Amino acid sequence: MTKIEAIIERAKDGTYTVYCKDEIFSGAGDTLAAAKEDMRRQMDFYKETAVAEGFKYPAFLDGEYEVSYTVDMASLIAYYVGAGIFSLAGLEKMTGINQKQLWAYLNGTTPRKTQSARIESGLRHLNDDLNSIFA
């Protein structure tokens, strides 16, 4: 199975964009799910058009493939804070990063790798806790 890497970004207007790292495919939508679905539809449309017109297309489109998504920290924070799932205070408790700094990340400041790792670690810890409760 071919693995396709895609990047998720949230625009300032609240919409989402998904684009493949090494392929030509992308998608956009008002929600993250809509952007992912738009990219999948574009991949299907590309293949259908290529077949109908006799053009070459990436071989992985004929078989099974998996899309692996990566999200930038600002988009990740915006998604969960914007949806009301987390507050900045809650993220501060999970990550140890103060709310003012998290707010800066939410508004476009790119966190250093160490700060990104702290955010990821905090979210993974929450995931582990939830998995242990509901396993």
Residue positions per predicted region:
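DNA major-groove recognition helix of helix-turn-helix/homeodomain DNA-binding modules
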Residues: 114-132
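Short, charged, surface-exposed hinge/linker loops at domain edges
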Residues: 1-3, 38-100, 104-105, 109-114, ...
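DNA-contacting interfaces and partner/effector-binding or oligomerization modules
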Residues: 1-54
